[in-house]
């Protein structure tokens, strides 16, 4: 099976700019030793991110648009028998990559290594940043609004492992 690396340059899911730059730099550095196929997807730089502290759905439309494009690209490459590796900016891109894999494979699991468990919902998020909802969305926990483009399987919660999480919300 061939490998394809997707650079998913987006920081729309967080309030601090810069996470979108990492995938581009990594893709540039990979050219010295990786000869396989790669695709770089970047967020639209004309987007003005929400800085409204009371906005509990920051950049939801823009993230949906970016993730829908990433999702479609991954599904297309999986059909061509590629194994996708997605290098993201913020963790909201994991929603698209996980749903694409769930659609392509019968049963998947996820190992989430992060101090942020990303298991908030639109009701429990304190920041409104969608990266805080990523793991909840892919395991089907109260975030169905984030699967606009995906009809199908989710990651079963019993197949999700958290490593390094500092704490979980009581909700």
What annotation goes with each model-predicted range?
Residues 2-171:
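Conserved alpha-helical scaffold segments that buttress catalytic/binding sites
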């Amino acid at each position: 099976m061939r490998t394809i690396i997707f650079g998913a340059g987006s920081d729309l899911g967080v309030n601090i700019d810069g996470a979108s730059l990492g995938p581009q730099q990594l893709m540039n550095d990979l050219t010295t030793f990786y000869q396989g196929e790669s695709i770089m997807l970047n967020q639209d730089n004309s987007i003005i991110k929400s800085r409204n502290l009371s906005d509990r759905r920051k950049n939801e439309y823009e993230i949906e648009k970016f993730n829908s494009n990433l999702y479609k690209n991954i599904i297309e490459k999986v059909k061509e028998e590629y194994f996708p590796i997605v290098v993201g900016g913020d963790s909201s891109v994991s929603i698209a990559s996980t749903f694409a894999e769930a659609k392509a494979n019968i049963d998947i699991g996820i190992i989430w290594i992060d101090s942020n468990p990303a298991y908030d919902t639109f009701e429990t998020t304190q920041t409104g940043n969608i990266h805080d909802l990523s793991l909840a969305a892919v395991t089907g926990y109260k975030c169905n609004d984030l699967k606009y483009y995906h009809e199908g399987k989710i990651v079963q919660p019993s197949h999700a492992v958290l490593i390094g999480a500092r704490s979980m919300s009581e909700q």
